[in-house]
From Swiss-Prot:
Domain annotation TrmE-type G: ranges: 232-390
Residues binding (6S)-5-formyl-5,6,7,8-tetrahydrofolate: 29, 97, 136, 468
Location, primary (coarse class): cytoplasm
Biological processes annotated in GO: tRNA methylation; tRNA wobble uridine modification
HAMAP family in the cross-refs: GTPase_MnmE
Cell compartments where the protein resides: Cytoplasm
Self-association and partners: Homodimer. Heterotetramer of two MnmE and two MnmG subunits.
Species, as recorded: Magnetococcus marinus (strain ATCC BAA-1437 / JCM 17883 / MC-1)
Keywords: Cytoplasm, GTP-binding, Hydrolase, Magnesium, Metal-binding, Nucleotide-binding, Potassium, tRNA processing
Entry-linked Gene3D superfamilies: P-loop containing nucleotide triphosphate hydrolases, Probable tRNA modification gtpase trme, domain 1, tRNA modification GTPase MnmE domain 2
Sites where the protein binds K(+): 242, 261, 263, 266
Family note: Belongs to the TRAFAC class TrmE-Era-EngA-EngB-Septin-like GTPase superfamily. TrmE GTPase family.
Entry-linked CDD domains: trmE (cd04164), TrmE_N (cd14858)
Protein's recorded name: tRNA modification GTPase MnmE
Lineage, opening ranks: Bacteria, Pseudomonadati, Pseudomonadota, Alphaproteobacteria, Magnetococcales
């Protein structure tokens, strides 16, 4: 589908493709019609010879000097320059990349020179937006690109990279095409109702809608995994005060993030640490000791702890091995969702003999012991966490829904499909069924960006960095 860009997007833009700040290398990216002609006047060979546009071979680096017109005697920078003629570029337009040194003052001056010569500073995500308008990617692929840039784990990066190749887009397009075909059969039933043509039966239309409904439902079933890939698997460490929660938090995070003392109630607020285990990001949360308290500040911390327990993907319940199951432990366990909890007996170094008995109905595979003081058993705790993580499904087809916008749009589409199904099942006029059906098609069209909804496009591309 041809997408029509806004008028201001026909000019030439410049932006940094590398992070700002001092570095060994900085890459400036330019895009727009005839952009090479705007850069060439400032480029010279190492021997001081002027450079012609015809001297550039597509996608071949050239070692050149950038000359500041205000100080032409000394090169402003020595760089590698490459030209990407349209349409064989990231944006689909003529593009030039300047690979120079990462001195902020030099980069700033180069941009000032080029902006004075007719180039405009790029808006956030404008290069990707132009790529979208030039059919180099659809909106789902653009979101996958941003997901790859922001990935905090290998698993999230791999899934985003997979979706950049168009796998998710292909699944969505197949479902949309099936909806369009269903609509065509419905229209045929309306248009040729008086002709000697056998239209699709209402049962056949329902079967087609059921197929699309099941496909979207399957995609929505991956949204929770997508959230965990994007934001991390949240693991809350909970238990009575002074059982070693903060010590375990520090041991797992590999640094002394939480204060550890022998005083009960030391931790009053949440401590967080980002980890990566088996390619999946983990948000580890140390919580306040759970108990009854008259201290108003501690009560706030305890309330926050229970809130995190409710939203956490997994829970590590810590108890003291030498004491066994206390009455306080039993009271806490009544409020904990056992299906997502790991029982950790801490302070093994103070225990003589075997681990104490847990509650009778507690699964054995969800129990382990550790000494945060000596490090004994820490690998076992990590192994149990990994076992919990490995229960998450793998989606090798690249159909994990990782963006909230995608999830919400699919949810709206499925509501409309269900509305059409109900109307058909109740024998309502086909003219009425066509309305929710066309709206569901619009939802899938909007999802991939084949639409003129400028607010949707702005929402997606505004989250990008300038150089993308």
């Amino acid at each position: 589908m041809l997408r029509t860009p806004l008028l201001h997007e026909q000019d030439c833009i410049i932006g940094m493709a590398t992070p700002p700040g001092t570095s060994g290398v900085a890459v400036l990216r330019l895009s727009g019609p005839g952009v090479l002609s705007l850069v060439v006047p400032y480029l010279y060979t190492p021997k001081g010879e002027k450079v012609a546009e015809s001297g550039f071979k597509p996608r071949v680096m050239r070692r050149l000097n950038f000359i500041d017109p205000q100080a032409p005697d000394v090169p402003l920078d020595h760089m590698l320059v490459v030209h990407f003629p349209n349409p064989h570029s990231f944006s689909g337009e003529d593009m030039v990349e300047l690979h120079g040194h990462g001195a902020p003052v030099v980069v700033k001056r180069i941009m000032e020179v080029l902006v004075a010569h007719g180039v405009r500073p790029a808006d956030p995500g404008e290069f990707s937006k132009r790529a979208f308008f030039n059919n180099k990617m659809d909106l789902v692929q653009a979101e996958a690109l941003m997901g790859l840039i922001e990935a905090t784990s290998l698993r999230a990066a791999r899934e985003a990279s997979r979706q950049m190749t168009g796998t998710l887009s292909e699944h969505l397009m197949a479902l949309k095409d099936h909806l369009v075909l269903t609509y065509a059969h419905l229209e045929a039933a309306l248009d040729f109702s008086d002709e000697d043509i056998e239209p699709e039966s209402e049962g056949g239309l329902l079967d087609r809608l059921a197929y699309v409904h099941a496909g979207i439902k399957k995609m929505l079933g991956t949204a929770e995994l997508g959230r965990q890939m994007r934001d991390g698997f949240e693991l809350a460490i909970v238990g009575r005060p002074n059982v070693g929660k903060s010590s375990l938090f520090n041991a797992l995070s590999g640094e002394d993030r939480a204060i550890v003392t022998d005083l009960a109630g030391t931790t009053r607020d949440l401590n967080e640490s980002n980890l990566e285990i088996h390619g999946l990001p983990i948000l580890l949360v140390d919580t306040a000791g759970l108990r009854e308290s008259d201290d108003p500040v501690e009560r706030i911390g305890i309330e926050r702890a229970w809130q995190r327990v409710e939203r956490a993907d997994g829970i590590v319940f810590v108890a003291e091995a030498q004491l066994g199951v206390t009455l306080e432990d039993k009271a806490l366990l009544q409020r904990l969702p056992k299906e997502k909890a790991l029982w950790v007996w801490n302070k093994l170094d103070q225990l003589e003999g075997a681990l104490p008995e847990c509650l009778q109905d507690w699964p054995e595979e969800q129990i382990c012991g550790v000494s945060c003081h000596t490090g004994e058993g820490l690998e076992s705790v990590v192994a149990h966490i990994v076992a919990r993580m490995e229960q998450l499904p793998e989606h090798g087809e690249g159909v994990v829904i990782m963006q909230l916008r995608q999830q919400q749009t699919l949810q709206q589409a499925i509501v409309l499909i269900e509305e059409a199904q109900e109307m058909l099942a109740n024998g309502q006029w086909l003219e009425l069924v066509a309305e929710p059906l066309t709206r569901s098609i619009d939802q899938l069209t909007q999802l991939m960006g084949n639409t003129d909804y400028e607010d949707v496009l702005g929402m997606v591309f505004s989250s990008f960095c300038v150089g993308k």
